[in-house]
Amino acid sequence: MPKSFRHLVQALACLALLASASLQAQESRLDRILESGVLRVATTGDYKPFSYRTEEGGYAGFDVDMAQRLAESLGAKLVVVPTSWPNLMRDFADDRFDIAMSGISINLERQRQAYFSIPYLRDGKTPITLCSEEARFQTLEQIDQPGVTAIVNPGGTNEKFARANLKKARILVHPDNVTIFQQIVDGKADLMMTDAIEARLQSRLHPELCAVHPQQPFDFAEKAYLLPRDEAFKRYVDQWLHIAEQSGLLRQRMEHWLEYRWPTAHGK
């Protein structure tokens, strides 16, 4: 065998070995979950009807419900990973979870770092305020006035939307998204701008509060599940969601959690 040809064969063999090692190193997230039998799901526990941490320390809500069903479809054990809106993307970068399910809105900032599943809900920001003040806060122009206090929870799209649209009104940051609506009832803030689905639910839980035109929110947003950049896992989650939607399961479970008897005393 000519020397040059022998060198070529050796080089090709080395490349084949490197390619094989690379493929093994690039084991998909889906394969990892199937092999470990564990699905790590991040959730905030502060966002009814999607995710709520109970007084007993467990979690309830639409996305917690769906997380359990996703784990079962994979033959895996569900492990809930607590996170928060300010820490969500940091926890993602640190690989603390396999998927985040917590009423998460799709936005380009998050999309630059992660994948999203197909959307499961269309939504948008709308005000919630005392029913006696509903006519006063119909537009962003009416809201963005000196003397108006808009309350926000830190680190999520609610704060981002408020800071982008309010230049004259005062923005009050409240650290607890569970008790934040009671602050409006208690007169510590005039309103909050949040997702229409949350505004509707909280107006039911707090009879003093009214969701302002939730059927016509100020902007457009979709909710989806936050995923690592793994094509195989994304395709699996997308197909699982598609089946749940087409079978009516998504609608049925959402109706259940919207009608659920959530604790209401001071937002707890």
Swiss-Prot record:
Sorted UniProt keywords: Amino-acid biosynthesis, Aromatic amino acid biosynthesis, Lyase, Multifunctional enzyme, Periplasm, Phenylalanine biosynthesis, Signal
Compartments reported by the entry: Periplasm
EC number: 4.2.1.51, 4.2.1.91
Sites marked Important for catalysis: 179
Function text: Forms alternative pathway for phenylalanine biosynthesis. Can catalyze two reactions: prephenate dehydratase and arogenate dehydratase. May have a role in chemotaxis or transport.
Subunit (UniProt): Homodimer.
Identification of the protein by name: Cyclohexadienyl dehydratase
Organism, scientific name: Pseudomonas aeruginosa (strain ATCC 15692 / DSM 22644 / CIP 104116 / JCM 14847 / LMG 12228 / 1C / PRS 101 / PAO1)
